[in-house]
Structures are given as structure tokens and as C-alpha cells.
Amino acid sequence: MIKQFDALIVGGGVIGCSIAYQMAKRGKKVLLIEKDRLAGKASQAAAGMLGVQTELKGDGPLYHLAKESRDMYPSLATDLKEISGMDIEYVENGMIKLARTEEEVQELVETASKAPHGEQIRWLSPNTLFSYEPHLSKGVAGGLYIPKDGNVSAPKLTQALGSASILQGAEISEYTDVYDFMKERNKITGVRTSKGDFYADETIVAGGAWSRFLLDRLGVKFKSYPVKGECFSVKVPGKIVERTIFTEGCYIVPKAGGRLLIGATEHPHTFDETITTGGLMNLIHLATSILPELVDAKWEKAWAGIRPQTEQGVPFMGRSEKWKGLSIATGHYRNGILLAPITGVIMADLIEGKESHPLHTYVRS
């Protein structure tokens, strides 16, 4: 019996699950294939920050794409809870990007003065900053406050998207290896897997840092590379920080239950997920230098994730020029959680022939 779908999605991280969710909502027959379990790699490791201004500089197209995606989260969280019953722990707690040098002060003050229309961004002097976050180090020179930024639980988001996809008619096959792509002339017609052959009008590769290995089999030279990031979490009694704190080389994300997630190192061009003492020592040094009370925190755990980066530094969301019936969505690097909602919409629009998003051409190039 031929197993035919409208779309096959290869990759069960947050990007693949977001695409499956959007396509299932539109009544498409979708199969998502994951070689491990959902949210098993970068989506499991991510801190879940929704930081537009802290992660993306300037007022370019990718910034506006990220802002649009961030603003989708309140309704997405509600929809996922109603459909799947799962809470993605979305909070709009705001984010503060710290300045520690005079050069950083000038840069952030200028950023605040040039904030895009409608974006609530403001500079906080040291006194104002300490009234917001009194436990920060008194050596901090001020901060850029972005009240609309927030965070989610990245694993729960991915799992909720997957569950909601299934409840809307999609199928998900975990622990399934993709052996090869099936072809007819210059068109991809499906995939050959450890659980059989599956056919579809469109195959979407959304395998994160591993996407390039899949594309290599088709002669598609996708220029991307992996970046390892190490993180750790601690528990503190009460709240020593209300908002996400971001500074060069380190972020501190408050979560439910007194947990703080702290990350992340950057080790490019490696798939080795080993956690190093050097990486953790550097993070601990940076984190305690801006939030001294962390020295008394209770250690919880450490982990590492592999993030996909492109040579152009922007994600790729679009069709293959070489193969009909093949689309690609990867390269989101540190912004996979932030960009997941809009990526799902863009890719679902693309498959339906609606290349109407004004930023679509930019992120595909």
C-alpha cells in the first residue's frame, strides 16, 4: 500500500513541528519524520528566549521577521493549550540587555533612541535599573529594557506543537531513519526510511544542523555548520531576578519553580555534545559577576545542544533550485524558538503557492 501525503517533514525539532502544525491546521495530510524523539536536540537544549532586540541588531528585514514571530506567541500559547492541553510556559517578563563598559552604554543608548516605531525599548540608568532588578551587581552601568520580550519552555513548545499537529490530523513517526530520497527525473517524490517508503507532493528538510547531510545525498551544497552551546540550570529560593538578563557571552533566564537557566557557550564546527569544565567555568564566572547571589544557588544540571548556522548568518526558508518538490527550513542558529511560529507560516504559505510574505525573498537568499 502506497503511503501518500501532501507533505513530508524531515526533522522533529521546533521548526519541523511548527511547519507540521501550520500545515495540519490548513487541512493538509502531513507526515513528520524524526530519527530520535521530538525535541531531542537543539530544541531540548534551548533556553526559550524570545529576544528580538538582544539577538538581532539593526532595523533590517530579519529583525521585523523576528518581531512578528515574537508577537504571535500570546495567541499561539492559548491555541496550543486549547488544542493539546499543554502549557508552553509563555511569559512576557521582559528582557534587559546590560551595559558594563562606556562603549556598551553609548551603543545601547543609541539603540534605544533609534527604536523602531511601536517597539517599547528604553534605556535604564543604573539607579533605575537597580530599582527593577536590585540583586544585579553594582558594577553594571545600565541596561536596555525591552518589556515585550519574554520566554517559553522550548521542549514543551516543541512537544505541544507536535501534539497539536497530531490532533489536527498530522502523523508523526519518531525513531525513524531516512535512508534516501526517492526521485523521478528532477523531482523528489518521497523518502525511503527504516519504517518503509513514504511519498509526498513536497518534502521539507528541517533537520537543524544535520540538514546538510541529508541535502548532500541530493547533491545540494547547503553552506551551514554546527555550533555547540553549553548551558546549565540552578535553583534559588525566592526570586533574585524577575526579567531575562542578557549580556555579552551570557544570559540568565528565570523559569517557574525558582529555576534559572544560564547559557550559552559557542563552539563552532563541532557536533560533539560533551560538556566541558572550561565552558561551564566561563559561564559561571560571567553569571556570578552580574548576579552575585548565584554563588549560593543550588546546582541542578548542565547540558549542550547543537545549533545550525548558515554562512550568510540568516536562516534559509525556501525551495531547492535543483529539485522540484524539495523545500528547506534551517539555519535559525540561536533564534529557532523565536522564529518558529513565523517559519511555520512562511513554509506552509510556500507549499500552498503563497509567496506573499514581504520578507520571504530575503530569508531565502
Task: Kindly give the residue locations of the regions a language model identified.
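C-terminal catalytic lobe of FAD-dependent flavoproteins
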Residues: 154, 291-365
